[in-house]
Curated annotation (Swiss-Prot):
Residues 26-626 are extracellular. The lineage of its organism: Eukaryota, Metazoa, Chordata, Craniata, Vertebrata. It is a single-pass type I membrane protein. SUPFAM superfamilies: Fibronectin type III, Immunoglobulin. Homodimer. The dimeric receptor binds two CSF3 molecules. Interacts with CEACAM1; down-regulates the CSF3R-STAT3 pathway through recruitment of PTPN6 that dephosphorylates CSF3R. It comes from Mus musculus (Mouse). This is Granulocyte colony-stimulating factor receptor.
Length: 837
């Protein structure tokens, strides 16, 4: 069952196949006619038998053509026998092959009753271009034709013929027909059905279901359409005496195909050198058989290809196919060339020189002979005129070793026929003036123009040499040429020039017997844009400006110089700007930018060959608020630094204003300040003793007590002394100097305060009070320093000393402070510092 709106060809066919036999026999389709011309109308009828009980007697008959929509018939009626019939006319059948279906409604779908196949096409056109050939190989007459347009219908082609006389106006015996195979446009009449040398009429008949047609009749004699087979070519072996006298010739022979030996034939020979772009050359009116044929005047090509074909002589017929190609090498003649040479020498040691010789053959005539190799030799005086072969090569260069005294070598080109005229190569010295102003420039991708200024001495010619200057290129091969005209100052190099390669070009002038010094220049073949542009770097940026910099590429050999730079920048709104800069600039400042904005910048490097862009650089200008914050932080840091420095300076100055800058004796190594032997000094205490009191005779060094002790601060008479006098009590004549020496102190030991032990004239032992002060000596009383003990001093009984008032005439109670031994080492800055005490 198939839906009414979706009934397809596959669906209805499947339903038809699955129908029961009783339902299948209910309907029947008739087509009139079943095959029509494409586009013609088709009449069809569908009948339903009255014996079909499964269908309603009033069922409506429907039609469907191929995949087109279902449609009712043109007219439906009942026949007298109760059969229902539906008629339909298809106005245009546009299918070459289609199915027509007869349907009836069945519940919610349609039921297939019957189907019929329709065919449409065209009647066959008359075949054309009928031709026949008599093949002696198959011994049959083979005819072929063109069938004409496609008919879309099965069409058969029949080759018909009959024997006749004269111009085929009289029909004789009929020859059996030849039916061509399907989709073949030829047919053969065997030899047994043919009468040679008798005319026959031949034509082709085409037939299909819509009609038939015939080609025009062809009247011929089978022997007039004979197609021969090609002859057999052979090469002849000629003796060497003939070859040497006749260079540039070929010798060959041929024989006709054996079945056609009895026929008179005329042949053609064609030959072609195996060279690019060479054409065939024809030789006409040759006989069908030749035991020896000489073909001369050939160019010195490596190999020639020869072919031959034949036709019946003086009679109608067809040319045979060309014979298979025969490859022959023409006889040679000795090369007739001029050898241009150029050499380079290198001294290996005092007795040996290495020579690299280049040469180039120049033909002296159109047919200069084939070259099979080059022979380079040297005549050594030690070998009594016998030549020493240095090189035997097919290349155009050779490297060899010679004694330093060798002056020349001999070069010849050779082949089987002989050698060319010898060329003497003289080793020239590099003397004479060189060319100046050498310049090279690429004209296009495969040519380079080279020019120069002629030297002061006009040369006979110039040697131009060029080679690739690349690490990956083999420098052993060089291209070179000799310009024989010394007046020329420029030349175009065309050979062996590859695009976009760096070339080293050398020009040397040629003088009689010498060659000038070579001059080099480098250039590229075919200029192109620089490979890359310098990379941009952001140096500084502000709110409305940005400074850019770049590093130019280092120049290289042959490098095309840049002409200028161009900087392009664009903002986020695709507003682009540009500026062109001189090639000497390496930085640039972009101005008038928007604050806090993004910009895309790139640099373009330009030469005369093109331009190349650098990689893009993206920058962002500063925001004014960010700049203010930055400046505020900077000012705050500077202010803080200034305050700290000022505070430190003021602190040091305040400390100096309270006391002098004197080291602390208790925490200093004063031993290094004192001399090794300390001079005893006489200390005086004014107004305490008279002039008869002897001076101090001995000063001992006290040791530091492990357990600190304190002097009796309540000794009698101390209260009346000044504070400074309480710290140190001295005796002796102030003008008297003791000559006794102090024992040397150890280096690094602390220098302790001294104590007077005894005096010969002293009425009693006096006790001296040590100060515990660790501060520099001041004018007022200070705390006592750490006490020190002396064993001998403590063993004596303590005595009280009552001081007297000081003499007002003295400037100091106990003289200048530097009279005290412990202050001798403080005299390091001069006497001018005494005011600090």
């Amino acid at each position: 069952m198939v839906g009414l709106g979706a009934c397809t060809l596959t669906g209805v066919t499947l339903i038809f196949l699955l129908l029961p036999r009783s339902l299948e026999s209910c309907g029947h389709i008739e087509i009139s006619p079943p095959v029509v011309r494409l586009g013609d109308p088709v009449l069809a009828s569908c009948t339903i038998s009255p014996n079909c009980s499964k269908l309603d007697q009033q069922a409506k008959i429907l039609w469907r053509l191929q995949d087109e929509p279902i449609q009712p018939g043109d007219r439906q009626h009942h026949l007298p026998d109760g059969t229902q019939e539906s008629l339909i006319t298809l106005p245009h059948l546009n299918y070459t092959q289609a199915f027509l279906f007869c349907l009836v409604p069945w519940e919610d779908s349609v039921q297939l009753l019957d189907q019929a196949e329709l065919h449409a096409g065209y009647p066959p056109a008359s075949p054309s271009n009928l031709s026949c050939l008599m093949h002696l190989t198959t011994n049959s007459l083979v005819c072929q034709w063109e069938p004409g347009p496609e008919t879309h219908l099965p069409t058969s082609f029949i080759l018909k013929s009959f024997r006749s006389r004269a111009d085929c106006q009289y029909q004789g015996d009929t020859i059996p027909d030849c039916v061509a195979k399907k989709r073949q446009n030829n047919c053969s009449i065997p030899r047994k059905n043919l009468l040679l040398y008798q005319y026959m009429a031949i034509w082709v008949q085409a037939e299909n279901m819509l009609g038939s047609s015939e080609s025009p009749k062809l009247c011929l004699d089978p022997m007039d359409v004979v197609k021969l087979e090609p002859p057999m070519l052979q090469a002849l072996d000629i003796g060497p005496d003939v070859v040497s006298h006749q260079p540039g010739c070929l010798w060959l022979s041929w024989k006709p195909w054996k079945p056609s030996e009895y026929m008179e034939q005329e042949c053609e020979l064609r030959y072609q050198p195996q060279l690019k772009g060479a054409n065939w050359t024809l030789v006409f009116h040759l006989p069908s058989s030749k035991d020896q044929f000489e073909l001369c005047g050939l160019h010195q090509a490596p190999v020639y290809t020869l072919q031959m074909r034949c036709i019946r002589s003086s009679l109608p017929g067809f040319w045979s196919p060309w014979s298979p190609g025969l490859q022959l090498r023409p006889t040679m003649k000795a090369p007739t060339i001029r050898l241009d040479t150029w050499c380079q020498k290198k001294q290996l040691d005092p007795g040996t020189v290495s020579v690299q010789l280049f040469w180039k053959p120049t033909p002296l005539q159109e047919d200069s002979g084939q070259i099979q190799g080059y022979l380079l030799s040297w005549s050594s005086p030690d070998h009594q005129g016998q030549d020493i072969h240095l090189c035997n090569t097919t290349q155009l260069s050779c490297i060899f070793l010679l004694p330093s005294e060798a002056q020349n070598v001999t070069l010849v080109a050779y082949n089987k026929a002989g050698t060319s005229s010898p060329t003497t190569v003289v080793f020239l010295e590099n003397e004479g003036p060189a060319v100046t102003g050498l310049h090279a420039m690429a004209q296009d991708l495969n040519t380079i123009w080279v020019d120069w200024e002629a030297p002061s001495l006009l040369p006979q010619g110039y040697l131009i040499e060029w080679e690739m200057s690349s690490p990956s290129y083999n420098n052993s091969y060089k291209s070179w040429m000799i310009e024989p005209n010394g007046n020329i100052t420029g030349i175009l190099l065309k050979d062996n020039i590859n695009p976009f390669q760096l070339y080293r070009i050398t020009v040397a002038p040629l003088y009689p017997g010498i060659v000038g010094p070579p001059v080099n220049v480098y250039t590229f073949a075919g200029e192109r844009a620089p490979p890359h542009a310098p990379a941009l770097h952001l140096k500084h940026v502000g709110t409305t400006w940005a400074q850019l910099e770049w590093v130019p590429e280092a120049p290289r050999l042959g490098m095309i110089p840049l002409t200028h730079y161009t900087i392009f920048w664009a903002d986020a709104g695709d507003h682009s700007f540009s500026v062109t800069l001189n090639i000497s600039l390496h930085d640039f400042v972009l101005k008038h930018l928007e604050p806090a904005s993004l910009y895309h910048v790139y640099l373009m490097a330009t030469s005369r060959a093109g331009s190349t862009n650098s990689t893009g650089l993206t920058l962002r200008t500063l925001d004014p608020s960010d700049l203010n914050i930055f400046l505020g932080i900077l000012c705050l840091v500077l202010l803080s630094t200034t305050c700290v420095v000022t505070w430190l300076c003021c602190k040091r100055r305040g400390k100096t204003s309270f006391w002098s800058d004197v080291p602390d004796p208790a925490h200093s190594s004063l031993s290094s300040w004192l001399p090794t032997i300390m001079t005893e000094e006489t200390f005086q205490l004014p107004s305490f003793w008279d002039s008869s009191v002897p001076s101090i005779t001995k000063i001992t060094e006290l040791e530091e007590d492990k357990k600190p002790t304190h002097w009796d601060s309540e000794s009698s008479g101390n209260g009346s002394l000044p504070a400074l006098v309480q710290a140190y009590v001295l005796q002796g004549d102030p003008r008297e100097i003791s000559n006794q020496s102090q024992p040397p102190s150890r280096t690094g030991d602390q220098v302790l305060y001294g104590q007077v032990l005894e005096s010969p004239t002293s009425p009693g032992v006096m006790q001296y009070i040590r100060s515990d002060s660790t501060q520099p000596l001041l004018g007022g009383p200070t705390p006592s320093p750490k006490s020190y003990e002396n064993i001998w001093f403590h063993s004596r009984p303590q005595e009280t000393f009552v001081p007297q008032p000081p003499n007002q005439e003295d400037d100091c109670v106990f003289g200048p402070p530097f009279d005290f031994p412990l202050f001798q080492g403080l005299q390091v800055h001069g006497v001018e510092e005494q005011g600090g005490f």
